[in-house]
Structure formats: C-alpha cells, structure tokens
Amino acid sequence: IISAIVGISMAYMGVGAWALVGQYLTNSFIDTFVLFVTNDWRPKLQFSFERAKQMLSYGWKVLLTTVVYTIEGDLRSLIIGKKFGSADLAYYDQGKKFPNLLVSNINTSISNVMFPVLSQCQDDRIKLKRMCRRAVKTGIYLLAPLLIGLIGVADTFVVAVLSEKWIPCIPYLRILTLVFLVRPFTTTCQQSILSVGRSDITLKIEVVVNVVAIGILFFAVFGMESVLWVAYGTLAAEVVSMGMFMFYENRIIGYTYKEQLQDLLPGISLAACMGILVNLIRYVPINDGLTLVLQVIVGAVFYVTVSYLTQMDSFVYLIKMLTEKSHNVKMKKILERMVKE
C-alpha cells in the first residue's frame, strides 16, 4: 500500500517512468525492513567454502534455468516489436497481462511454499507424490474456473473494461490464457524435482523447451509473418514443457501419466463447461457491463453447484479445510452440510 501511494504520488508530480522505479524500490525496501524486524536471523562476517561449493553445484543450474526462461520471454516481445510494430506488441502484451496477473502471484506462492515442504519428505517418495497430487488437484480446481472463465468472458470483458479499441487483443488473450492454465502444474512438478536435488533436470527441460520455443518463434515471425502464430507457438512450447515435466514426474517420483490426467481433467472439464455457458450469455441483449456481471455470477454459481452435487475431491478437501479453520459456529454448520458423508 505504501509503495503504491509513493508510485501514484510521483506520477502526479509528473516524473514519468521514474514513478514505477520509486514504487518498486519502496516496495523492496519495506519488504527488506519487515523481514529484518520479524526474523531473528542476522548475517555474520563468516564464509564457508565447503557450503559454498555444495550450494553452487546445485544453485547455478536453478539460476541458469531462470535466466534462460527470462531471456526467451523478453526475446519474444522484442522481436514482435521490431518486426510488427508497437501496436501489435501492445495487443499481444495486453492479451498476456490479465492471465499473467491471475497466475503470477499464485505461481510465486507455489514456488516459495512447495519447495521447503517437499524437501522435508524428499526421501519418502510416496508422501512426496501424495503432496504433489494434492497441490495439482487443488491448484487446478481453483485456477481453471478463473482462467477458462476469462476465455469465456473475453469479448465482454475487453469491451467493458478496456474499451472497443482493444478488441484486437481478444484472440491473444484467449490463447495466452491457455498457456498460463498449465503453469501451476509445471511449477509444482518443477518444485518436486528440485526438492529431490535434481536441478540438472529442470535445466535440461528449460533448455529443450526454449530451443523449441525460439524455433517456433522464428518460424511464426519470419515464415508465417503473424503475431497470432507467435501466440500459438507459445502455447505449443508450453505443451512441450508440460509433456517433459509429466515424463520426469513419472520417472522420478512415480507420479504416473494416468494419475496426472486424473488430477487435471476433472477441474479443467468442469471449468470448460462453465466457460461455454458464460460465453453463451454474451448473446443476451443487454449492455456489456451488465453482461459481464451476469457471466461472472452464473459461472460461479454453476461451478460451485456442480462441485457440490458431484462432491468433487478438491471441493470436499477445501470445504473440510475451511471447516477446521473456521471459528464461527454457524459458518461451521453451513460448511459441514456441504460435504456428504
């Protein structure tokens, strides 16, 4: 909140792009200060070459994986801007912004939480797999309706929120939302592989995926000369990434292909039905703002109702977890009635 106030204040003062710099630096400073105050650990003027050697043998692969991923992502925007111009780049980036907004914070949370938790049971592959399955099922159950719902309401959302001048970004929004749909799954798989000390595998996957992605990117830009093909290429590269992670999950922790599909498909299938339903609502003859509100309400009611009627595993798990956390007696009773014994 403080960093946002600083950024907005600097923008009103007319400092231009420096407002973003001020907001970012303020946010980083406050984060560091809060961690310093709340954490008992303090750095000491000591250095262990033995520990540094152990950390570097593992950490350089993780670092290089992140660098390769970042370079490939920035290269795509750079080439689109150079080859097709700022307008096409703006439509592409706008299409990526909203699904990225939904997924990025969740993905960061998954990375920060999953790695230390999974590392504690790295020697117990059965428990490790069980925790991965729970994370995948719950993550896809929560995210699929948001992302597939965004695909369903894309037309009314763009017009109502951004205005009609952004209509050309709708195809990119739909395609790139599918890209982000599988990110939590691949992130969970990545953290499980890292937790057993196999950072070499995540580096291998990232290199292969990015070689494929760059090859598709150049074909889309210089062969097909289409930004839309760039978006499809991004989706294809994500499918390759997902396939490789599925292979290594099966190989390393015994998370079989059948189990992975069993965990992914229920949430995605229900969300797809919801997406089709909310998309049909756009034909109701009312203004775009009201249509968007109606789509969101109908979609949410449909998703929760079907989850309740079918007693989906992730729905039951979340309700039981909320029941345990709730201190309100009336709320507990309501939640308990939602789970059929």
Stretch-by-stretch model annotation:
Residues I1, S9-M13, W18, N39, ...:
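Membrane-interface junctions at transmembrane-helix termini in multi-pass inner-membrane proteins
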Residues I2-I30, D200, V207-G243, Y255, ...:
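Membrane-interface helix-loop junctions in multi-pass transport and translocation proteins
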Residues A17, F33-L78, V113-R130, R251-P266, ...:
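Interhelical loop/hinge segments that connect adjacent transmembrane helices in multipass membrane
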Residues A17, Q54-V62, I79-N100, K129-M131, ...:
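Interfacial/gating helices of multi-pass transporter permease domains
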Residues Y24, Y58-T66, T70, D74, ...:
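Residue-level signature of transmembrane alpha-helical cores of multipass secondary-active transporters
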Residues T65-T70, I214-F218, A271-I286, R337-M338:
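Hydrophobic alpha-helical transmembrane segments in multi-pass integral membrane proteins
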Residues Y91-V207:
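Specific pore-lining/lateral-gate transmembrane helices of multi-pass inner-membrane transport
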Residues N250-Y257, L264, I276-E341:
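Membrane-proximal transmembrane or re-entrant/amphipathic helices at the cytosolic face
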